[in-house]
Amino acid sequence: MYFAIRLSFVLAVLICLTGNGSARMLDADRNRLQQLQIRSQQSADANTQVDIAYEVIGIYDKYKGQGGSNVLREAQLNSQVNDFKRKTMVIDGVPAQGGVWGILGAIKKAADAVPDNVKKDAENLVKSSTKVLVRGIYDYLMGKMKH
């Protein structure tokens, strides 16, 4: 009997510690998402935008598919994330199948041949599409983390 009481006490403590750890992780991820969203809105650099997007995607991957998920919205976000990853994937410094980096790389290599307004338009496209992705994931996760 003494062993059963002691074991139940130990299990109760472990459950409390695990729950508290999850709450801290949730708070940390929520705070990090807020920081990344602010940085995304303030940054004017395409490379920084892509780095921010990958970090936000990492947080999204931790929480997608969990209880209270909106299956339709997650399917849309998953499609956007996969499209983004496909277009920005770099393997050994080389863009996979062109993508965004192929566009930017081609622009950088042929900098003298490409007008400045075309270079600027390509960078603006990268920045705006990345901001839209970050904002979509941010809005979804912040709504989900309130519960």
From Swiss-Prot:
Keyword Glycoprotein recorded: no
Signal peptide: 1-23
Coiled coil stretches, renumbered: none
Main location: secreted
Record's keyword annotation contains Calcium: no
Family: Belongs to the Turandot family.
Name listed for the protein in its UniProt record: Protein Turandot Z
Species: Drosophila melanogaster
Name of the gene: TotZ
